[in-house]
C-alpha cells in the first residue's frame, strides 16, 4: 500500500486541509452533478484540479518559472511530464460516487462497513504480509491516513499476533505524494527493498513492524531490518484530536444533499445532456483550455510559432552575475512566497470554518460515531498450539530457535530471514517446511514463544533429544548469528539460554 489512504478522516489539525473539503463542498452531491454533466461519466480533470489547488505557488508560478529559467535543458522533460500528467481519465458515475461516498466521506472501509458481493470487507481478513509506505511530505495521503486504520481495526498488537498477521510500515521523511510513485530515488531504494523483502516477511513472527532502511557498506546495497512496534508508535504520528464525530456529521449532511439533488435536480439535468454536450463541457475545463489555448489549435498562436524559431536560433544565455537575473529571481521568489501565504490563509480559513460548523457539542450529540463492525475472531492463534509446546522434532526445534533469536532484541534483520530461508531449502529435514508450511511453522512457534517463552526454550531439549541434532540446530543458528560482537545483548542472552536448555555449546 504505497501512498494509499485507508483512514480517510485522519490527519493533523493545521497541516492536512484536504480532508475538510468534503464538508465545505456539501459532500458527494457534486460528484453526482459532474457525472450527470458528463453524460454518466466523471471527468478526471476535476480530481487533478483539486490536487493542483493544494500548492498554488507551484501550480501558478514556480513550475512555469523553472521551465523558462532553464529553457535550454527543461523543454523535453517538461513536455513529457505534462503529457503524462494531463492524460485525464474518466470514471463512471457509479464508480466515483462509491469512492467518495463509501471511502472519503463515509470512511466505511476501516470500520468494516463496505459491502461487496453480498458481504462486508473486513481488513482483518487480509492474509499474507501487509506493507504500508507513507511519507511525512505527502499532503494527499498523510501518514495518519495511511496508518491509523491499524489501531482502529486491530486495537492492540496482541490482536495482530493472535490472528497471525504481519503488518510492516515505513514512513519517508519528505517525499511528496507524486514522488512516492514516480521518484527515481524512491524507486531505487524504498520500492526495491520492499519488493526484495516480500519473500522474507512471512518468516517474521506475527506482529507490527517498522521497516528501517540504512545505507550498507557496499555501493547500492542497503541494510534492512524490521523493528517491532506498538500501536502507540502509530498514534504518536497523530495529534490526539478526536474529530470523528465532525466527519460523521459531514457524512450525514452529504447523504442529505445527495438525496435532495437526485430527487429534485437530477431529473432536470439528465434530459438535456447528450454525449456531444458532455464532450464540449469536458473540453472547456480550465486544465484543458490552459493547455490547448497556447497550442497550434489556437490560430492566434501562429505568429508566436515563427517568433519561437527565431528566438531559439538567436538564444544567448545571460550570465549568472547579470543584475537583472538577480532581480528576476528575487521577484520570482517573492511571488512564490505570496502565493504560499495566500494558500496558508485559505487553508486556515477553511479549517476554521469546518470546525466552527461541524465541531460543536450540538452536532456531537446527534452524530456520535458507531462502533466499528470490523473485527472477526477467525484464524486466531490456535489454543491447541500451546499444547504442542513439547511436540515435534528437528524441524520444529530449529524453527523455534530461529524465531526466538530473530525477535529477541525487538529488531529483525532481513539478512537473517533470508539466510534461514536459504538453509531451509538445503537441509533435508527442513526442506519439507518450504513455502506455505514454513510460514505456518513460524506462526506456530512464534505463538508458543509469545505465550510461554521460558517453557518454550526449556522444551527444546524434548524436541531435540539427540546430541547430534542439538549440535546441528545450534550450528544452523550460529551460521546466521555468528558474530558475537555484533549481536544485541538480548540476542546473546537468548542464545545462551538456548545453549543451557540443550546442555551444549559450540
Per-region residue spans from a language model:
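Mobile cap/lid helix-loop segments that gate and shape the active-site cleft of serine hydrolases
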Residues: 85-121
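Short beta-strand/loop motif that positions the catalytic acidic residue
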Residues: 126, 132-134, 138
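Catalytic active-site module of serine/aspartate enzymes centered on a nucleophile-bearing elbow/loop
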Residues: 158-252, 257, 334, 348-370
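Short secondary-structure boundary/capping segments
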Residues: 13-25, 146-153, 184-189
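Conserved alpha/beta-hydrolase "acid-adjacent" motif
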Residues: 140-145
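Alpha/beta-hydrolase-fold enzymes
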Residues: 2-94, 222-318
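Extended non-globular C-terminal regions
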Residues: 265-396
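Small-residue-enriched hydrophobic alpha-helices in membranes
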Residues: 364-506
Amino acid at each position: 500500500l504505497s501512498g494509499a489512504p485507508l483512514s480517510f478522516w485522519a490527519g493533523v489539525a493545521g497541516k492536512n486541509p484536504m480532508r475538510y473539503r468534503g464538508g465545505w463542498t456539501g459532500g458527494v452531491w457534486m460528484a453526482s452533478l459532474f457525472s450527470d454533466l458528463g453524460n454518466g461519466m466523471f471527468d478526471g480533470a476535476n480530481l487533478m484540479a483539486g490536487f493542483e489547488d493544494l500548492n498554488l505557488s507551484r501550480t501558478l508560478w514556480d513550475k512555469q518559472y523553472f521551465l523558462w529559467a532553464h529553457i535550454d535543458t527543461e523543454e523535453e522533460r517538461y513536455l513529457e511530464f505534462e503529457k503524462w500528467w494531463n492524460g485525464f481519465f474518466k470514471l463512471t458515475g457509479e464508480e466515483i460516487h462509491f469512492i467518495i461516498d463509501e471511502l472519503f466521506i463515509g470512511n466505511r472501509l476501516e470500520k468494516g462497513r463496505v459491502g461487496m458481493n453480498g458481504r462486508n470487507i473486513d481488513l482483518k481478513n487480509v492474509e499474507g504480509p501487509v506493507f504500508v509506505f507513507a511519507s511525512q511530505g505527502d499532503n494527499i495521503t498523510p501518514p495518519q491516513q495511511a496508518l491509523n486504520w491499524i489501531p482502529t481495526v486491530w486495537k492492540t498488537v496482541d490482536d495482530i499476533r493472535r490472528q497471525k498477521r504481519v503488518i510492516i510500515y515505513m514512513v519517508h521523511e519528505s517525499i511528496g505524494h507524486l514522488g512516492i510513485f514516480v521518484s527515481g530515488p524512491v524507486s531505487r531504494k524504498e520500492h526495491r527493498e520492499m519488493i526484495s523483502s516480500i519473500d522474507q516477511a512471512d518468516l517474521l513472527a506475527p506482529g507490527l513492524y517498522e521497516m528501517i532502511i540504512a545505507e550498507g557498506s557496499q555501493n547500492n546495497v542497503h541494510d534492512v531490518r524490521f523493528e517491532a512496534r506498538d500501536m502507540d508508535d502509530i498514534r504518536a504520528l497523530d495529534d490526539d484530536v478526536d474529530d470523528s464525530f465532525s466527519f460523521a456529521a459531514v457524512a450525514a449532511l452529504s447523504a442529505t444533499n445527495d438525496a435532495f439533488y437526485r430527487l429534485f435536480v437530477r431529473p432536470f439535468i439528465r434530459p438535456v445532456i447528450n454525449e456531444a454536450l458532455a464532450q464540449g463541457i469536458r473540453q472547456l475545463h480550465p486544465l484543458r483550455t490552459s493547455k490547448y489555448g497556447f497550442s497550434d489549435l489556437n490560430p492566434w498562436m501562429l505568429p508566436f510559432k515563427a517568433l519561437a524559431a527565431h528566438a531559439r536560433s538567436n538564444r544567448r544565455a545571460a550570465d549568472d552575475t547579470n543584475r537583472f537575473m538577480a532581480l528576476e529571481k528575487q521577484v520570482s521568489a517573492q511571488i512564490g512566497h505570496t502565493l504560499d501565504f495566500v494558500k496558508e490563509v485559505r487553508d486556515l480559513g477553511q479549517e476554521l470554518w469546518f470546525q466552527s460548523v461541524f465541531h460543536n457539542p450540538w452536532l456531537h450529540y446527534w452524530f456520535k460515531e458507531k462502533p466499528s463492525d470490523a473485527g472477526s475472531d477467525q484464524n486466531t492463534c490456535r489454543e491447541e498450539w500451546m499444547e504442542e509446546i513439547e511436540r515435534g522434532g528437528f524441524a520444529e526445534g530449529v524453527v523455534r530457535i530461529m524465531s526466538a533469536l530473530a525477535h529477541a532484541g525487538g529488531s529483525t534483520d532481513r539478512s537473517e530471514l533470508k539466510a534461514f530461508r536459504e538453509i531451509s531449502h538445503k537441509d533435508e529435514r527442513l526442506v519439507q517446511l518450504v513455502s506455505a508450511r514454513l510460514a505456518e511453522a513460524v506462526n506456530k512457534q512464534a505463538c508458543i514463544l509469545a505465550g510461554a517463552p521460558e517453557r518454550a526454550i526449556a522444551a527444546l531439549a524434548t524436541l531435540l533429544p539427540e546430541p547430534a541434532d542439538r549440535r546441528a540446530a545450534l550450528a544452523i543458528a550460529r551460521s546466521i548469528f555468528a558474530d558475537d560482537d555484533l549481536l544485541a545483548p538480548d540476542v546473546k542472552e537468548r542464545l545462551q539460554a538456548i545453549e543451557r536448555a540443550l546442555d551444549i555449546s559450540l
